[in-house]
Amino acid sequence: MAIERTLSIIKPDAVAKNVIGQIYARFEAAGLKIVAARMIHLSRAEAEQFYAVHKERPFFKDLVDFMISGPVMVQALEGENAVLKNRELMGATDPKKAAPGTIRADFADSIDANAVHGSDAAETAQVEVAFFFPGLNIYSR
């Protein structure tokens, strides 16, 4: 099994609910290490750049508006099969379809306010981690 890194964002809805610690506990219980983390309030330009892959999709404006509506907690996670493991922890994008016990089933309100973002592939993860943590701001342990 390969040690990977993935990006996780705890979105404004979950930050506002004060469940960062509960979500972090789930990462750690699953064997994922938090190797970089910071709280930020994204600017419109940053959110548009980060989600540029969705620019032509009908939900793009709503996604950007939501992501700049409050602070987010951004973290790089490291562990065996980190991308897949994080996606399993998150659950389905629509919390109504998310399996019980997943982050979205437990903390998300809607398909838009769905608590967390996670990289969808190892290649995407590299780009996303570098977007928020350029240079040597990651500390493997």
Swiss-Prot record:
This is Nucleoside diphosphate kinase. GO terms for biological process: CTP biosynthetic process; GTP biosynthetic process; UTP biosynthetic process. Homotetramer. Keywords: ATP-binding, Cytoplasm, Kinase, Magnesium, Metal-binding, Nucleotide metabolism, Nucleotide-binding, Phosphoprotein, Transferase. Belongs to the NDK family. Its main location: cytoplasm. GO terms for cellular component: cytoplasm. GO terms for molecular function: ATP binding; metal ion binding; nucleoside diphosphate kinase activity. The lineage of its organism: Bacteria, Pseudomonadati, Pseudomonadota, Betaproteobacteria, Burkholderiales. HAMAP family: NDP_kinase. PROSITE patterns: NDPK_LIKE. It is found in: Cytoplasm.
